[in-house]
Every structure is written in C-alpha cells, then in structure tokens.
Amino acid sequence: MTGTDEVPRNTGSAVVGLFIVAALTAVGMAMAGGPREIGGQALPVAEALTSERAKAPAGTARPTPEEVRELETNPLLADGIALAAVTCRLPAISRDPAKLERYYKTFASCLAEAWKPALDQANEPALPATVQVTLPETSACGKVPSEAEAVAYYCGGDTTIYAPTEWMLSDAGLERSRHLATMAHEYGHHIQRSSGILSAAAEKMTSPDEDSPADKERVRRIELQANCFGALALAAAAGRGSISTSLAGAALDTYGNTDDSDTHGSRRNQLKWAKAGFVGKTTSSCNTWAATASEVK
C-alpha cells in the first residue's frame, strides 16, 4: 500500500487538522499515469491539549482520556498494549455504492472495537471515526485530492475516512483484501490522530511543503506506522468471522505491492513494518519513531 501523507509544519499552539491520504496500488492493476501520488492539506482546528496528563492521587478516579502529543514515548506505544481479538461479520462486498458503504462502515466499527482496549490502556480517547463514500465540496482539511492523486484519504480535522466508491472500485475492483488493507491503513491514521501522534509530528515539521529530507523522513515514519497499525488490526481480526486467515494474509501482502517512495518508504520497508504489526501483535511493534533512519528509508 502506498500513501503520501503530508503533515503540516508547526502552526504555533494549534492542533492541526491533518489531511491524510492513502493510495492503494497493486501489481497487476493498471492505472493511468502509474502509481498515484498523494497530496494533503492541513488546517488549524483547536487549541492544543497538553502532553502532560494530570497525575491523579491514589484512590481517585482515573484522569479523563486525552491525546498525548508525543512520538517515541507516546503511551499508546508502551510495552504490552495489544488490540482486542475481534470477530468482523462483514456484508458481501459489492459494486453497489450503498452496499459498499455498508461494507466499509461495518469494518470500521469492527476496527474501533479492536482498538478501543489499546487506547483505554494508554488513557487516550477513542475518537469516533466517520466513513464517507462521496467527496465533500469542502471539509475541515480544505481542498480534496483528485482521483489521479488518491484512492482514499483521512482528514483529521473532521476525523473522517473518505473512500469514494468509484475511486476504490476503479483501483481495487472487488478484491476484498485490498479494500480491507486500505481501510485498516486509513483507520491507522485515525488512531495516530486520536493518540496525539499526528499532532506531535506536525509540530516537528520545518519546511514549507514538508519537502526537506528531515520532514520527508518524518512523513515516512507516519506512513510506515499506519501500515503497521493497519496490519495490527488485520491480525486482531484474522481467522474469525468474515476475515479468514488467508484473507488477512492477502491483505497484509498488499502493503508490499507498491513502489519505492521518498515519502512512504521503500517497498521492502513498507511491507516490513506491516509484517511487524501483523506478527508482533502489540503497538510497541509499530514504534517507527524509535527506529533508525535506515529502517524508515
């Protein structure tokens, strides 16, 4: 899976509405103009939450969950945090827009169920994610990409996964593994948004279009982590309900069906990080922020 996520440079004390886009390209699926590059925009949406959570005295109620604007040390990436095993009972995939929308929304609900215990353990919010299969005229993230640029994208400003049915079907047909891989990856960006990882990354950006070598490396760490988070969720659902072990494995392989990219990582690393989540089964397996530069090339 490929995806070009543009993260805005630091905008002072604002939490940015990150516009995350993921394009899924697979070997054997022809696309005009080759692999689609992804673009994104970001808008300030709210004042930042502090990354220092209040320490509650012994015997008092647990602090209210809040995002933590940290990267390598984000509580979500602590040792021992795992997703819940889930049984995803999905409807039949279809070219009918209403039925495909139901397929995506049902899977997104299953992903939310898998991720909630991990977010609870980190005391971070399980923000609701919306799935929309039509393009908005405007959104909290500004101008939307064209079909030539993306297959699906995530907007952190309105916590919405946009997966236009025409774009998705044109790219993936009815190949369930590719639809699942795309949605799991996009939901991975939603988890980054919920936890504060995206906001923390945004604060580190220094170049106007995130095109400096250092900023591109940060973008790769975001993208590769979304692959890992996506595969982590696939593993949590594998072998139960509508997601057989073989289907989950095929979805995992999708993350390696791409080209090398200076904003998304090498083909090898894109698959490597997905496998890290699928096999490791804990969020700490997805700590791209603690990885060496060569591991996120």
Labelled PLM ranges:
Residues 115, 181-196, 226-227:
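Active-site recognition of the HExxH zinc-binding catalytic motif
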Residues 165-182, 216-218:
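Short pre-active-site segment immediately N-terminal to the catalytic Zn-binding motif
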Residues 103-158, 220:
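Auxiliary, metal-adjacent structural segments of Zn-dependent hydrolase domains
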Residues 193-219:
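Post-HEXXH active-site segment of zinc metalloproteases
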